[in-house]
From Swiss-Prot:
Entry keyword annotation includes Nucleotide-binding: no
Domain of life: Bacteria
Family annotation (Gene3D superfamilies): D-tyrosyl-tRNA(Tyr) deacylase
GO cellular component: cytoplasm
Subcellular localization(s) per the UniProt record: Cytoplasm
General function of this protein: An aminoacyl-tRNA editing enzyme that deacylates mischarged D-aminoacyl-tRNAs. Also deacylates mischarged glycyl-tRNA(Ala), protecting cells against glycine mischarging by AlaRS. Acts via tRNA-based rather than protein-based catalysis; rejects L-amino acids rather than detecting D-amino acids in the active site. By recycling D-aminoacyl-tRNA to D-amino acids and free tRNA molecules, this enzyme counteracts the toxicity associated with the formation of D-aminoacyl-tRNA entities in vivo and helps enforce protein L-homochirality.
Gene, per the UniProt record: dtd
GO-annotated biological processes: D-amino acid catabolic process
Keywords: Cytoplasm, Hydrolase, RNA-binding, tRNA-binding
Alphabetized GO MF terms: D-tyrosyl-tRNA(Tyr) deacylase activity; Gly-tRNA(Ala) deacylase activity; Ser(Gly)-tRNA(Ala) hydrolase activity; tRNA binding
Species, as recorded: Ralstonia nicotianae (strain ATCC BAA-1114 / GMI1000)
Protein name: D-aminoacyl-tRNA deacylase
Subunit field text: Homodimer.
Length: 166
C-alpha cells in the first residue's frame, strides 16, 4: 500500500463543487492499494503514517508526528484521499499503466478499512470520496512531502528469500 503524505497548514477536497473533507494543520495523505495488499498492509501504512515525525519540535527538527504536532499533545488533522494513480507503472512509453493498482473493489475495501482504522486511532480525520473526481487544494507547509510504501506480504517474503540466497 502506498501513501504520499504532505505536511499542510490546510487542505480541502471538493466533489461536484461541495467540500467533502477539510483540515487545518496536519497531513494530506493520498493513499493507494496495490495488487496483493491486505488489511495487514493498510494497518502497517496507517501506523507508520500516524507516527512519522514530520512536524518541527521546539528546536526546529522534524521530530513530532501528526498525533502531537505542537509537542504538547495537540493532534493535527488527517485528510485521506484515495488515488490509484500512485501505483502507476511509468517504466516504458508515454502512457502510464495501472496494472500494479488493486482492482477497484479491493481498493475500495482497503481504503474504507484504512479510513475506519484511522478514525479509531486519530481524533481528526476527514476524507475524499473513493472513485470520485475530486479537486484537492492544499497549502503545503515546507514543502514537506514523503512517499511511504508497505509492500504486499508476498513481495516482502520474496525479497527476504532473495536476500538469503545472495
Amino acid at each position: 500500500m502506498i501513501g504520499l503524505i504532505q505536511r499542510v497548514s490546510q487542505a480541502a477536497v471538493r466533489v461536484d463543487g461541495r467540500v467533502v473533507g477539510e483540515i487545518g494543520p496536519g497531513l494530506l495523505a493520498l493513499v493507494c492499494a496495490e495488487r496483493g495488499d491486505t488489511v495487514a498492509e493498510a494497518d502497517r501504512l496507517l501506523e507508520k503514517l500516524l507516527n512519522y515525525r514530520v512536524f518541527s519540535d521546539a528546536q526546529g527538527k522534524m521530530n513530532l508526528p501528526v498525533r502531537n504536532i505542537d509537542g504538547n499533545g495537540l493532534a493535527g488533522g488527517l485528510l485521506v484521499v484515495s488515488q490509484f494513480t500512485l501505483a502507476a507503472d511509468t517504466k516504458s512509453g508515454t502512457r502510464p499503466s495501472f496494472t500494479p493498482a488493486a482492482a477497484p473493489e479491493a481498493g475500495r475495501r482497503l481504503y474504507e478499512h484504512f479510513v475506519a482504522r484511522a478514525r479509531q486511532q486519530h481524533p481528526i480525520v476527514a476524507t475524499g470520496e473513493f472513485g470520485a473526481m475530486m479537486q484537492v487544494s492544499l497549502v503545503n507547509d515546507g514543502p514537506v512531502t514523503f512517499w511511504l510504501q508497505v509492500a504486499p506480504q508476498a513481495v516482502r517474503a520474496g525479497e527476504a528469500e532473495t536476500a538469503k540466497s545472495a
